[in-house]
């Protein structure tokens, strides 16, 4: 990789210092190892090229250096980085049983360490400082970096970004209301912390930076609309100054009933003078009507500024909660990706955590690269992406959208790469009982029935609650119908995202020509993994 030089400091600019500050240094490029792919209902072989979308398991410093060495410089239209915050917390992942049995069985079964956010003096800033030049080099000239942080380090990180990206490329600071203060927190000393900051920088503001203004839709009851808007026979409306509208355009708006005259006056059209005015004086207004949703509900669109209080945090959207710490909501990433990128653009998330960025990028038709050093994060992201990709595959074939009615734009799958040996799971699944049936037809199909899986903590709970079966302790099942013993190339995955949803245990996958080795992998709720293989000769 070529050397990366920082831009010269601006005259009179502020440069941040900290204990142990040193110029960024980078490791030599490493070649990651392909460990897994997922392409719904596609038969793949050793000769098949892996999908372009990719998830890296390992230190993102290695991943960023590798991407530059592999020719990705200047490719990413948008980078969303959600690094640790220097919170002083050892973050854990909470695992819950998937069951509709009594509520006491739906509590936390196990808490597992995921990542440490505890730093020695100066180490946190050096950690971020070392990665910023690499992120800058990966950005397209018209691209933008969105760096997510909170009150602890936002002031320091802005200084670092000014130094690495140039103060002239600062675009804005988004204040996102990530939570609403409740309980004892409302009495916090000198007010509770209820917001995060997102620092937005351009690679080259003069390019200019890709930008799509955003609008937000607000629903109002009839009483709320009546208190905020005027009303006529066509409904509720607001007015706006017509500005430099021509005489002909004003006549057209008047014919449509969209001009408003104040003080109870009328709109006068003077053909001789070629002017349109209000009979009782004052300025004319152009009417903009609220959309009626029926049942006394109305919708209004408004522009979005840099205070985002309309996107709830995870605490008020529990349906998205995957149990992974510091998870961000999909609505937040939807707005960011829609504002700074287009369909088909490359998006990078070097701290992907629970996988919100790649999941949203997949739905919005962006191409993506993501990375995380936590194996638990990689497992959570893989499971999430498996569910999204299968839904996108269905949407592409029958034009149905996802659960919220949005059309999934990209049925493409993804590949997983590792820079280090995959960490062995803390607790593995035991014996897996399968029933395999080959069904011949126009396309050969294999029916796979998972009859039982020996999961240690599920077995102990079943002694107390006999109705509890192995499915309650399973997060996902994936099947590779042509396993080569090296890379797990899944063609089908059962990865329910809803907390209480369970895997079905019965699947149909397209079959390659016999003989073939079919592999079934089960991941339990504690991150334990087990794979069993069956040789099918005919």
Stretches found by the model and what they are:
Residues 134, 139-145, 343-344, 364:
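Short glycine-dipeptide loop
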Residues 74-93, 161, 347-361, 370-371, ...:
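Conserved proline-anchored active-site loop of SAM-dependent methyltransferases
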Residues 56-74:
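Conserved RecA-like ASCE ATPase "motif II neighborhood" in helicase/translocase motors
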Residues 54-55, 314-346, 352:
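Glycine-rich adenosyl-nucleotide cofactor-binding module
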Residues 84-127, 142:
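Mobile active-site "lid"/loop adjacent to the S-adenosyl-L-methionine
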Residues 71-72, 132, 138-140, 165, ...:
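A generic alpha-to-beta junction signature in SAM-dependent methyltransferases
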Residues 1-37, 41-48, 52, 69-73, ...:
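Accessory, often C-terminal, charged low-complexity segments
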Residues 59, 371-373:
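Conserved acidic E/D residue at the C-terminus of a beta-strand in Rossmann-like folds
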């Amino acid at each position: 990789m070529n050397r990366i030089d920082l831009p010269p400091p601006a005259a009179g600019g502020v440069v941040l210092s900290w204990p142990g500050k040193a110029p960024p240094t980078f490791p030599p490029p490493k070649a990651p190892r392909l460990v897994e792919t997922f392409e719904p209902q596609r038969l793949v072989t050793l000769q098949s090229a892996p999908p372009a979308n990719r998830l890296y398991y390992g230190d993102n410093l290695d991943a960023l250096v590798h991407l530059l060495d592999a020719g990705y410089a200047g490719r990413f239209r948008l980078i969303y980085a959600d690094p640790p915050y220097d919170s002083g917390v050892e973050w854990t992942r909470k695992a819950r049983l998937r069951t509709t049995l009594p509520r006491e069985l739906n509590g936390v079964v196990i808490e597992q360490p995921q990542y440490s956010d505890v730093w020695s003096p100066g180490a946190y800033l050096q950690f971020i400082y070392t990665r910023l030049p690499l992120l800058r080099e990966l950005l397209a000239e018209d691209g933008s970096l969105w760096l997510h942080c909170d009150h602890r380090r936002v002031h320091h990180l802005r200084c670092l970004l000014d130094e690495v990206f140039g103060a002239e490329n600062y675009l804005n600071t988004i204040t996102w209301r990530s939570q609403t203060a409740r309980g004892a927190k409302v009495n916090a000393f000198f007010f509770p912390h209820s917001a995060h900051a997102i620092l937005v920088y351009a690679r080259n503001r003069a390019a200019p930076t890709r930008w799509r203004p955003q609008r937000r839709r607000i629903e109002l009851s009839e009483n709320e609309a009546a208190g905020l808007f005027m009303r006529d026979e066509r409904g509720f409306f607001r007015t706006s100054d017509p500005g430099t509208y021509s005489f002909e355009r004003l006549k057209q708006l008047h014919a449509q009933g969209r001009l408003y005259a104040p003080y109870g006056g009328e709109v006068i059209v003077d053909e001789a003078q070629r002017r349109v005015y209000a009979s009782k004086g004052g300025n004319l207004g152009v009417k903009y009507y609220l959309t009626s949703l029926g049942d006394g509900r109305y919708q209004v669109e408004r522009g979005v500024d840099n205070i985002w209080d309309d996107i709830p945090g995870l605490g008020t959207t529990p349906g998205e909660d995957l149990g992974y710490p510091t998870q961000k909501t999909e609505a937040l990433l939807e707005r960011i990706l829609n504002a700074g990128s287009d369909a088909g653009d490359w998006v990078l998330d070097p701290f992907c955590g629970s996988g919100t960025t790649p999941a949203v990028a997949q739905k919005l038709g962006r191409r993506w690269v993501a990375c995380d050093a936590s194996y638990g994060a990689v497992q959570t992201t893989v499971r999430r992406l498996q569910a999204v990709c299968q839904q996108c595959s269905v949407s592409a074939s029958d034009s149905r959208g996802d659960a919220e009615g949005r059309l999934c734009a990209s049925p493409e799958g993804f590949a997983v790469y590792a820079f280090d040996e995959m960490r062995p799971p803390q607790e593995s699944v035991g014996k897996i009982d399968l029933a395999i049936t080959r069904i011949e037809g126009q396309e050969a199909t294999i029916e796979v029935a998972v009859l039982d899986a020996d999961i240690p903590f599920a077995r102990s709970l079943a002694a107390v609650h006999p109705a509890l079966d192995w499915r309650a302790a399973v997060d996902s099942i994936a099947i590779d119908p042509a396993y080569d013993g090296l890379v797990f190339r899944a063609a089908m995955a059962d990865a329910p995202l809803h907390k209480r949803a369970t895997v079905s245990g019965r699947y149909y996958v397209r079959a390659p020509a016999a003989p073939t080795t079919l592999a079934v992998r089960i991941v339990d709720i504690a991150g334990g993994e087990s794979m069993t293989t069956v040789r099918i000769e005919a």
